[in-house]
Amino acid sequence: MTIVLSKPGVDGLSEAVGALREWQTDEAPLQLHPGDLGWFWRAGAEATAAAVRTWSRDGRILAVGLLDAPDLVRLTTAPDAQQDEELARQLVEDMAEPERGVLPAGKVYVEAPTGARVRDLLFEARWNADEPWTPLRRDLTEPVKNPGVRIEVIGPERAHVRAAVHRASFGSPKFTDRRWHMMAAGLAYADARCLVAYDDQDNAVAAVTVWSAGPGKPGLLEPMGVHQDHRGHGYGTAISVAAAAALQQLGSSCALVCTPNSNVGAVATYESAGFQRLPQRLDISRCFSG
């Protein structure tokens, strides 16, 4: 059967999110998660739909891609399609040809799960290994300790607090209250929570959003940040522990997060919160035009 590349539109986002939820397993390498779409949803449903690509055969979605930036597609496939030769070749062709609407000409990047056949074919097509990332995982079968600081679960009336901590953590003015509400209106946020940590003076010092993929499946931290005025006091560790506890309450089997190798502080923070490093994953890039 022919493999069909599609832009699902707003009405098709539920099917893409559902596929990503289904594909999350403890055995799979870190991959595109419904929470990644959920976090992108801060730009609105229409923008999220415009950034999603699906590949289907005989009516079944086999792969989902998220254009997390104009030059970056984050891609994963159904577990039983990881080694599907026809699918992998179609993915490579579609990502190589700008007119197909996946990636533009010039320098572009692909994120794909370690071990997926599409990675092998990209390297055969003269794509290159690029930025290394460190995935980390925390098992949630055992009770999670108290984080040692006050934690607030943020609802709509307190969105301004979550947004302010994010802006102060990442130096980005874009995450406004309005963006929080757009994110919270998205399909994936039904299984998500926003948490804020406070210090002894009741200052909001760190924040995280956690995304469940359903009971018994891996959950995701995306994003986590510590207010620039309150770093160096262990609040990143505390909010990461609180994130693990929240995912445990949501029924997640484990908590996952991924950060660039170059962000050694973040890696150390997650490790101090009980996360264990997984084998690094390399992005893949193309410098030629097609």
Regions found by a protein language model. Give the residues of each.
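A short beta-loop-alpha structural element at the N-terminal edge
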Residues: M1-G18, R150-A163
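Conserved donor-binding loop and adjoining core beta-sheet/short helix segment
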Residues: W23-E99, V208-G219, H227
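Flexible, substrate/cofactor-facing loop regions flanked by secondary structure
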Residues: P34-L37, P143-G219
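A structural microfeature
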Residues: A63, E131-P132, V205-A206, P279
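Acyl-donor-binding surface of acyltransferase catalytic domains
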Residues: A69-G148, L282-R286
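Conserved acetyl-CoA-binding loop-helix of GNAT-fold acetyltransferases
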Residues: Q83-E97, P223-Q228, G232-Q249, V267-S272
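Conserved hydrophobic beta-strand within the GNAT/NAT acetyltransferase core sheet
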Residues: V108-V110, L221, A255-T259
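Short glycine/proline-centered loop/turn elements that form peptide/ligand docking sites
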Residues: W180, S240, N263-A266, S285-F288
